[in-house]
Amino acid sequence: MDLASLRAQQIELASSVIREDRLDKDPPDLIAGADVGFEQGGEVTRAAMVLLKYPSLELVEYKVARIATTMPYIPGFLSFREYPALLAAWEMLSQKPDLVFVDGHGISHPRRLGVASHFGLLVDVPTIGVAKKRLCGKFEPLSSEPGALAPLMDKGEQLAWVWRSKARCNPLFIATGHRVSVDSALAWVQRCMKGYRLPEPTRWADAVASERPAFVRYTANQP
């Protein structure tokens, strides 16, 4: 595995990320959520992609792609491991979204290329990174109140918003993926909340990927 070459690719790709709002439809008609996981001891990469109507946030389509894992887990290079399955799930969708929430980092990455940015560049779609853990940067401690907010900073640059979406829950790290500004990324996540820690697009993607009770109930109620 030539990490020097991958690192150079990351730096080059990151320079192409658009950090301002370039949505083709604003507000969007369809918002997608994407979640990647691994099965069979990491040998299979599974990507779930869901489509929600906006503003109702009604689930209208979901696809799950499973492909052979092409790369081992290497911290800092996760997007190379995850994007092939995301592309496979993307190709399965019968209609394409105007905005994608990706479970993972956007520019809040040491070389500014998390999976949300990498995927957004590959398919040229506006993306937002919604991550559950910090990868780099620093932020001031948040109060315990829901809605507490602080910028995630690294070398004088804001990479994300750290936002406590729900009381007694760890905060989310919300970042530009591609073609969405950091402030708009936060605003879109806030518009897509329904009382859970995660916004609806990534909550549904996780539910589909892991066959959680919410998804089991949904499928049971389908004609």
Swiss-Prot record:
Reactions the enzyme catalyzes: Endonucleolytic cleavage at apurinic or apyrimidinic sites to products with a 5'-phosphate
EC number per UniProt: 3.1.21.7
Region forming the signal peptide: none
Pfam families per UniProt: Endonuclease_5 (PF04493)
GO BP field: DNA repair
Alphabetically ordered keywords of this record: Cytoplasm, DNA damage, DNA repair, Endonuclease, Hydrolase, Magnesium, Metal-binding, Nuclease
Leading EC class: hydrolase
pH dependence text: Optimum pH is 7.0-7.5.
Site features described as Interaction with target DNA, chain residue numbers: Y73
Function, as annotated: DNA repair enzyme involved in the repair of deaminated bases. Selectively cleaves double-stranded DNA at the second phosphodiester bond 3' to a deoxyinosine leaving behind the intact lesion on the nicked DNA. Has a wide substrate spectrum. In addition to deoxyinosine-containing DNA, the enzyme cleaves DNA containing urea residues, AP sites, base mismatches, insertion/deletion mismatches, flaps, and pseudo-Y structures. Participates in the excision repair of hypoxanthine and xanthine (deaminated adenine and guanine) in DNA.
Quaternary state and interactors: Monomer.
Full protein name: Endonuclease V
Source lineage: Bacteria, Pseudomonadati, Pseudomonadota, Gammaproteobacteria, Enterobacterales
Gene name as annotated: nfi
